[in-house]
Amino acid sequence: MSDDAYSRLEAQFTEIGRLDDIRRLLDWDRATVMPDGGSDARGAQLETLAALRHRLVTQPDVARWLDDTDPGALTPWEEANVRAMRRMHLHAASVPSALIEALARAANRTEHLWRRARKDDDFSSVEPALGELLALIREEAA
């Protein structure tokens, strides 16, 4: 069962990695070429992506596959992968999906406001959103 469990984990986390790549591409686009009017739509996209990623990392099968892996049957590289997957799963499982979505929403809003504030040299306009984002980050860390 260990080989099958590891193969399933590898496939699952490959998909999660692709979602991370998509998020980075969307972030890059937002930072370089996206017009201001696209911020709300991009925020919704990033929020959906964060929720989907969270669901994939925390689904019950992942916990079962992690438990079913036999470290003795794995290469050192695979063992390191399983340790990283387990850390990712445990962290994600301890954070509610609603908080993940709220973080994505707040991060998008804060970045949009920051870009405008930087251009206008008006930090005070972004301060409330930044405070909200920091509060959510603290909640995630708790």
Model-derived regions, located:
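A well-structured
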Residues: M1-A142
